[in-house]
Amino acid sequence: ADLSMAVRIVDNAKTSAPEAVNSIESVLVHRDRAAEFLPKMKQALDLHGVRILGCPDTCRILPGASPAAAEDWNEDFRGYTLAVRVVDSLEEACAHMESHCGGVAVGIVTNDIAAAQRFAGMADAAAVFVNASTRFLDGGEFGLGAELGVAGQKLHVRGPIGLHALTTMKYIVTGSGQIR
């Protein structure tokens, strides 16, 4: 992946509106890129005072990162805190997200088209962002007008249920480094 693009996307997705539902709460980094990427990411996030909670590998790479507790991987921080984990594979990343992601938005930064397609297919989220900030998850940005909220659940209707009410949407957004 283009590490400078990844840093820009993470910085934007966390710090442009950290209280927003489309702000990221965690970052998963492949082991092969962690030692090079994480210090660059931290340098950008330090400008905003972001606190990093990390797995043991993250804490070894980033002096000043605090150890993440088990519950931190499920936390909706809505502020300047980010949980960071080093993973060995795309499958491990997707398994982590399946256990800990709220189902609203996930993203990947990669130059590998096949990996991006596999990720988009495996990710169980309302929106999947490939090489673009999750901050684009917004009714207005998607051309849907003002939104009342963003749902991560697959079924959210009450009362009589027609076929349309049983349909869920999964948006896959592909970019080349776009931030909002």
Feature locations, PLM:
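ALDH superfamily catalytic-core signature
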Residues: 1-78, 130
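Conserved C-terminal structural/oligomerization subdomain of aldehyde/semialdehyde dehydrogenase
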Residues: 69-180
